A protein has these predicted regions:
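A short, terminal or domain-edge coil/loop segment
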Residues: 35-36, 51, 80-90, 137-144, ...
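N-terminal, charge-rich interaction modules
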Residues: 111-128, 142, 233
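Conserved PLP-enzyme active-site core in the AAT-like
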Residues: 1-103, 117, 122-126, 134, ...
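Oxyanion/phosphate-interacting regions
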Residues: 107
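Conserved C-terminal alpha-helix-loop-beta "cap" of PLP-dependent enzymes
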Residues: 125-221
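Structural signal for terminal/edge beta-strands and the immediately following C-terminal loop/tail
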Residues: 213-237
């Protein structure tokens, strides 16, 4: 499941599974951080893979669910090529605990807490000329929303990339969703925030935008911005 593909002209998942199964092809879904742990299997997937460290909030590990013969084939890689990538027992027990906690957690209360954070951030963002903010629902239909912050450089005098860079350079870094930063906007994501984190983000956002008003933020080379994480690996001595 990808957040980075076109959102129109796609066949339904049911149809996709039907075509694959008619040709004897198993459907394996990399569901990563999908919220619903049952939908894909219920609609025909043979194997679904979830991260235990994203929405589930567990340690770094993965959960593989589906057809028993394919799961067994995957398990056999414990003595094959997959051995070098195996997780420790701590992560396995942590993933189990995360699943158990997910089953009993109050999802509605968490959703309300996330909505409160979005309102707080939006109030700050729209108080600046040239900055717009709107709450946007998740494009893959997970029950969550994010704050889309759009910056008009002609009015605000600093670009979205410059603001994102400044946020990431705070004493406590604020990392935004910047997949389409070249279009002049980024997203703030309220998922898995601990108590006090929403206020920390709002304070940093306020400070960065306020400082940009006093003096435009340094320009950001978008090519270098896009390659910064890779360049960091290359520059590591």
């Amino acid at each position: 499941m990808s957040h980075h593909v076109v959102e129109y002209g796609q066949m339904s998942f049911d149809c996709f599974c039907k075509i694959c199964h008619e040709k004897g092809v198993a459907v394996i879904v990399d569901a990563a951080s999908e919220y619903d742990l049952r939908t894909f299997i219920n609609h025909g997937a043979d194997v679904v893979i979830y991260s235990s460290h994203k929405f589930l909030g567990g340690p770094t590990a993965g959960i593989v669910a589906g057809s028993s013969d394919l799961i067994q084939a995957g398990y056999m890689q414990n003595i094959g090529i997959g051995r070098v990538m195996k997780v420790g027992k701590e992560s396995i027990f942590g993933a189990i605990a995360a699943l158990q906690a997910w089953k009993v957690r109050d999802h509605n209360a968490i959703r309300e807490k996330e909505t409160s954070a979005l309102r707080l951030w939006k109030k700050i963002a729209i108080s600046f000329d040239g900055v717009q903010a709107e709450v946007v629902d998740d494009s893959t239909h997970n029950p969550l929303s994010r704050l889309k912050i759009s910056i008009n450089k002609e009015i605000f005098k600093s670009s979205a990339a410059s603001v994102a860079t400044a946020l990431s350079s705070c004493k406590i870094p604020i990392i935004v969703r910047d997949h389409e930063i070249e279009l002049g906007y980024f997203y703030l994501d309220p998922c898995n925030l601990a108590d006090g984190h929403a206020e920390l983000v709002s304070s940093s956002l306020q400070n960065v935008l306020q400082n940009a008003l006093k003096k435009p933020l340094p320009e950001v080379d978008l090519d270098k911005y896009r390659n910064s994480s890779i360049q960091g690996y290359l520059d590591w001595k």
